[in-house]
Amino acid sequence: KMLLIVDRGVVKNSSYYNKIKMLLKKYKDSLIEIQLRDDEEPSYDYLDEVAGKVRKIPNLDVIIGIGGGSSIDMAKAICALYTNPGLSIKYRGFDNLVSPGIPSICIPTTAGTGSEVTVNAVFTDKSQMKKLGINGRYMSATYAILDAKWLQSCPKSASISSGMDALVH
């Protein structure tokens, strides 16, 4: 079974999303899709909400994440949480994950965060109002697909923000 995690902005604004859906059409019986809400930065609470739903899917083989840095972080973290029980916040910090997650394929639609190739995923801890990460060897994507055509659907403001993000790293 495959899980496609995609942010709503990609669904609304990218013709490439439809191409991916067409490519995966032959797997429709084993494909599940979750569209992430895009009204705020992802929090540990939201991560736990989505991970709770995903953990109920038996025999999940791979997660495909499509979107900006936050969506890619969600996809990577959900891969890890599928095999590591409990609330996500207990894995905050470095190398607190016990088991490797299931395989992931990350397709970024912005250039700058590099989330698809890092061992970090950042979420907001609402109790502290801070962005803190789950970091470590089990947080990297299995595969990253980089295609400049995906960047064409990125809004100008997001391109500017992610470009600045790349410069400050």
Please describe what each predicted stretch is.
Residues T83-H169:
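A glycine/threonine-rich phosphate-anchoring loop and its flanking beta-alpha core
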Residues K1-V62:
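ATP/NTP phosphate-donor binding region
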Residues N59-I78, T109-S115:
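Glycine/serine-rich anion-binding loops at beta->alpha junctions
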Residues Q35, N59-D61, G65, P100, ...:
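Alpha-helical hydrophobic/aromatic positions enriched in membrane-embedded helices and signal peptides
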Residues K19-I20, E49-A51, S71-P85, V117-T118:
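Short Gly/Thr/Asp-enriched flexible loops that form oxyanion-binding sites at enzyme active sites
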Residues E33-I34, I64, M74, C106-I107, ...:
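General beta-strand structural signal in soluble alpha/beta enzymes
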Residues N13-S14, M74-A75, S115-E116, I160:
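Alpha-helix N-cap/helix-start motif
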